[in-house]
Amino acid sequence: MSNRVIIFDTTLRDGEQALAASLSVKEKLQIAMALERLGVDVMEVGFPVSSPGDFESVQTIARTIKNSRVCALSRALEKDIDAAAQALSVAEQFRIHTFISTSTIHVESKLKRSFEQVLEMAVGAVKYARRFTDDVEFSCEDAGRTPIDNLCRMVEAAIHAGARTINIPDTVGYTVPSEFGGIIQTLFNRVPNIDQAIISVHCHDDLGMSVANSITAVQHGARQIECTMNGIGERAGNCSLEEIAMILATRKNLLGVETGINAKEIHRTSNLVSQLCNMPIQSNKAIVGANAFTHSSGIHQDGMLKAQNTYEIMTPESIGLNRNNLNMTSRSGRHVIKHRMEEMGYSEQDYNLDALYEQFLHLADKKGQVFDYDLEALAFMEAQAAEDNFYQLQQLVVQSDSTEGVATATVRIDVGGEIKTEAATGNGPVDAAYNAIARATDRRIDIISYKLGAKGEGQNALGQVDITAVYHEQNFHGVGLATDVVEASARALVHVMNLTCRADKVADYKQNMHKNRELGGV
């Protein structure tokens, strides 16, 4: 049996299902390119039949990615497989991933079919997918709750039909490691053609067992792990890619397997996914959390000074996190900024150097010293602003009356190329800014959640505002970054405004599509 574990990343498919707002095609491509640099073997990038937008993003990524195999999901239906094959046809190497439910509760309650009918559908889907590619993966949805006899029959039939990879998902995160390991071992013991396919696992974290179950599966013969960056995904999330990669690397002496992951790209990729997906990383998150390599105890600090491995089983440098920061001030030249971005693993195609340097000088004049996290925030904020936004905040001026508690805000906003200036009052500066923006955009939304955080520490921190707003009975999540909390709040609101504008365009597209179908008699 091979000692190489295939890393199958599904951040852009399963991971995206957890997001408050869908990623744009440009954002998905940026993440896909980061995953390629990270060294994932396979990246599942969407469900093409689900929407024109998903089809476009899968096709765009398939056309761009060269070093990783691009995969798309499909149900065990010919129309799904056709859409996946069409979207992937431009790729240098691709995989079609088809699935069907196999547990009794899913077969009877969701599919309302017999197991024999489901078995026939699975075989038909695999055979049909093989018309387009030799690389077909088949998943037994809810395998963790599937009767073992049925699971063995399904796996054997799918392999016989031509599936090269068989995925065993713990779809609802129900199993514990000893149980899940037993399922994998039973498949190896009882399925006669098991050696003709790679066994994969896809574990969810509903009971916090996803990583442990995946590692146990590897110990019992699985050689592909499906995972996401930062563990994002449906409900409680998926198996965390960075945790799996570092467990297999750090405990190679015990587990005896390896991956092709370039661990030095982990920190950079984690931050990119967090920023673009608007999902902050908890401080105590293993591997990539802010406290993962922080030592507060005096005893621990003393031990670290004497020998680093007294309290660290891996180094921050191993995941691409540099311990030493270069002091950057307004006197730093453009080459210093470029050098620091390169040291953090970014290439010039990831950001606009001219725009970043201009923003850097502005921030350095305000803060004095600028840190690595400031540069990353500025780079992503610039990328966000350039994303074909209909609304762009150009200026914000706020005046507050401390005695009356009333504030006045004046905003200048580019609204689709037309500059509008509006003023409004409110109960505090943030409320006033929001009222002025609403007046300038003539777009009404209801804010249901407002969270204020910080990028960095102490007085040098950047303010980060995360808001959730309701528009046409749908929730939208926006984020804003600035040295000033009011400006960060305004940027978060404008971010949401642009998301709702994009949603309106999608709604119009869907309406026209339905009209065309009705006219065509489809």
Curated annotation (Swiss-Prot):
Enzyme class name: transferase
The entry's Mn(2+)-binding residues are 14, 202, 204, 238
Please give the superkingdom of this protein's source.
Bacteria
The record's region (Regulatory domain) falls at 392-522
InterPro entries in the cross-refs: 2-IPM_HCS-like, 2-isopropylmalate_synth_dimer, AIPM/Hcit_synth_CS, Aldolase_TIM, LeuA/HCS_post-cat, LeuA_allosteric_dom_sf, LeuA_bact_synth, PYR_CT
Q: Which residues form the Pyruvate carboxyltransferase domain?
A: 5-267
Where is this protein chiefly located? cytoplasm
Pathway involvement of the protein, from the record: Amino-acid biosynthesis; L-leucine biosynthesis; L-leucine from 3-methyl-2-oxobutanoate: step 1/4
Catalytic reaction list: 3-methyl-2-oxobutanoate + acetyl-CoA + H2O = (2S)-2-isopropylmalate + CoA + H(+)
Please provide one cellular component term from the Gene Ontology annotations of this protein. cytosol
Q: Localized where?
A: Cytoplasm
Record GO terms (molecular function): 2-isopropylmalate synthase activity; acetyl-CoA C-acetyltransferase activity; manganese ion binding
**Entry cofactors:** Mn(2+)
Instruction: Name its GO BP terms in alphabetical order.
Output: L-leucine biosynthetic process
Q: Which CDD domains does UniProt cross-reference here?
A: DRE_TIM_IPMS (cd07940)
EC number(s): the record gives 2.3.3.13
- Gene3D superfamilies, from UniProt? 1.10.238.260, 3.30.160.270, Aldolase class I
**Keywords, ordered alphabetically:** Amino-acid biosynthesis, Branched-chain amino acid biosynthesis, Cytoplasm, Leucine biosynthesis, Manganese, Metal-binding, Transferase
- What assembly does the database describe for this protein? Homodimer.
Family the UniProt entry places it in: Belongs to the alpha-IPM synthase/homocitrate synthase family. LeuA type 1 subfamily.
Briefly, what is this protein's role?
Catalyzes the condensation of the acetyl group of acetyl-CoA with 3-methyl-2-oxobutanoate (2-ketoisovalerate) to form 3-carboxy-3-hydroxy-4-methylpentanoate (2-isopropylmalate).
- What is the designated name of this protein? 2-isopropylmalate synthase
Origin species: Shewanella sp. (strain MR-4)
